[in-house]
Amino acid sequence: MRDDGARGGFGASAGGASAGGESLVVHDVAALTNLGVLARKAVALDAQALIRVRALPAGSPDDLVAASRPAGVARVWATTPFGPVACRTMAISPGRDGRDDVVVRADAVSAVTGDARSVPQVDAAVPMTLECGAAADSSWPGSVPVDGGWTVVDAVPAAVFRDLEARARGVAKEESGPQGLPTSLLDQKVLTVRGARPADAAGNEGGAAAAAKREGGPVAEISMREVFALCAMGFIPVNPSADEPVRVSVKGRWRRLDGRFGSVYVSEGLGVLPL
């Protein structure tokens, strides 16, 4: 880790990535904290986890948060052992000139972000460059979706996901073997979310009328892989309130679950990681 302005006690060297590896430039303290949390959660689940940082063009559409963004913002992805990839949006840039999409090991990112006591408390300590070791682009499992074009299916109470996780953990205690959670449990479709047809989305009828309008609308079938990933990455509270939502969206072969603290993505055509 180094401070590009020689502030905050993290070192004095400045510039782009070192010749021997990749670097990330962190633009605010919140991003430094969130990057460290994401990396440590990923490593806790899988010691071989990867982090992928893909820059967002300035002013690019973003249906997660806002209609436009400043420069220096990226999607930060993390692999999980369940198959879906986790994602947060942060004020981070790939450090090497000309690169807008880099992959590094999550344990390297965890090491250079330190713990909460080493994070500076003011944005005067940033931008800061983090040396993250060798590139791991060839190890990334599959692709990640491009921004835009998502269809929101519906919102589901976060408590539903925590309940599904708790019940599945109970089953897993009895059925798990030396290879971890059984594939049959992970692949099980546990929740079907149906949305209204676009022309009917503004309606608020209940009962049979609402059910009829949902016929022909977007559908998302959620598996335990997504439930475990969303919960294990801490993207929803452990004890959510009754009105805490998880937004479910679809785009072609992709599904996305948006929790308060981050999102998980899964593709029906994307190979899953072994447990």
Short names for language-model regions:
Residues V112-L275:
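Long, compositionally biased intrinsically disordered terminal regions
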Residues M1-A91:
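N-terminal ordered "arm"
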Residues G5-A6, V102, V109, A202, ...:
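Intrinsic disorder/low-complexity detector
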Residues V85-A124:
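A broadly used, surface-exposed interaction patch
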Residues P81-F82, I92-P94, G269-L273:
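A short, sequence-level motif marking secondary-structure junctions
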Residues A44-L45, P94-D97, P274-L275:
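Short, low-complexity, polar/charged sequence segments that are solvent-exposed and flexible
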Residues A19-E22, A47-I51, P70-A74, V85-R88, ...:
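Generic structural motif recognizing short loop/turn segments at the entrances and edges of beta-strands
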